Amino acid sequence: MNSIWAVVPAAGSGRRLGGEIPKQYREIAGAPLMEHTLRALLESPDIRGIVVALDPSDRRADAIDSLADVRVQTTPGGAERADSVMAGLELLATEGAEEDWVLVHDAARPCLPLESLTALIERARRSGEGVILAEPVADTLKQVGEDGQISGTVDRQSLWRAQTPQLFPLFA
């Protein structure tokens, strides 16, 4: 593993959340969610640089102080999350090396402890394979038939909730 880059898709409108302000710009603890997210990534000495994929018509990005950090660059994002991730990967393809890795982390997920990020990176280094953060499913899950009636309880023993960041070889 050579360098680790981060791609932060941030072009979304947050339709599911609703409201006038996209969720990455909603404030908690005095700063937009994306500001907290970028600070968490910038805190890691393992991350060489960050590409933030923004909506080309975004007028709120000026509120994100971390975008001015020399390790952060922006690129136009797309209509969907996958489009924004691809835009970030395409930019990195021109700068990254064959041995580089990329970490994808959502702009509106600010609660990323440095310890979790470091453990994720160490696991990738040891295994040489892509890794994700995940946690066991704790909620009871029900299976429902076509008639809308509960037909059973799902065994959660092997079920995990995928989270971000997700870390993979850049040129995989």
Residue ranges, per PLM feature:
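Short aromatic/hydrophobic "clamp" motif used to bind/position activated sugar donors
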Residues: 102-103
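Conserved core of the sugar-phosphate nucleotidyltransferase
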Residues: 111-172
